[in-house]
Amino acid sequence: CAYILDDELYNKIFLIANASLYPHYTLLKQNATYFIPLKTDDIHVQRGLFFPWKVGISKRLVIPDLDKYTSNLPKNQIPIMENFTLNLDKVNHMAICGNSGSGKSYALTYLLSVLKNQSDLIIVDPKFDSPSRWAREHKIAVIHPVENRSKSDFVSEVNERLSQCLNLIQQRQAILYDNPRHEFAHLTIVIDEVLALSEGVNKAIKESFFSLLSQIALLGRATKIHLLLVSQRFDHTTIPVSVREQLNVLIQIGNINSKSVQFLFPDLNPEGIVIPTGHGTGLIQVIDNEHPYQVLPLLCPTYYTTEGIL
């Protein structure tokens, strides 16, 4: 019996093996067939199909007191799930994507609570919603729309702040030129519902916003300046392609199918990935040298925080 060694065969084996091994092991979805050489001189069996895997399945963190939990975290550590923690020093920029009601704001509030002890924060909240309430509780300034100002004025204010961040990047680059080992404090620019900023504004203002975002995304890594972007979608009308290519923590929450993942994970076919049901579930990909680069099932932490924020 002969088989064509192609992506179709590889995916069929993946579907069978991933379901059969659940919940003891999780196979990591590949975008294409993964061959490895075998130690033999027989040309007929010198190759094998390899399926990367990890022990166990994704498990949700349950946090009874979020403020107490985040105040005791080690420096630059961002726990996402059990046995899955991000190192802020290895993070370039982050994106959270999901349809309305999927749990984006809940996930963002968690990340804000963790980051407040590890990074300076600049928060842009076009909806004047939960990020603003969280910031009020923690006495952090927020850029938000004001009743008697136009949307173009609001986005211009955002551009002004992004321009200041770009100047800071250039100042830090000059310091790094003389001392490459200089340690900077992290600065995270949080923009909730990016699509609300880039739609329906003056073309010149939008182009300025995109240009500033692109420059920060491209230059911010070495100077410890990060973007945390949240949106219902991340197509080219929401953020420039150059920004999307610099994201190395990608989170998709909510309904998972080939259409919903097409912007953050354009090469991914989610078929066969076992995604738990419930709020705050989805996919995560972390592109660094500490985590497998494949997409993993995600369960966002469950936590309890100050009443009136969410």
Model-flagged regions — what are they?
Residues A95, H186-I191:
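Structural motif
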Residues C1-V91:
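Basic- and hydrophobic-enriched, low-structure N-terminal and domain-boundary segments
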Residues L28, L176-Y177, G254, S258:
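Secondary-structure transition/capping residues
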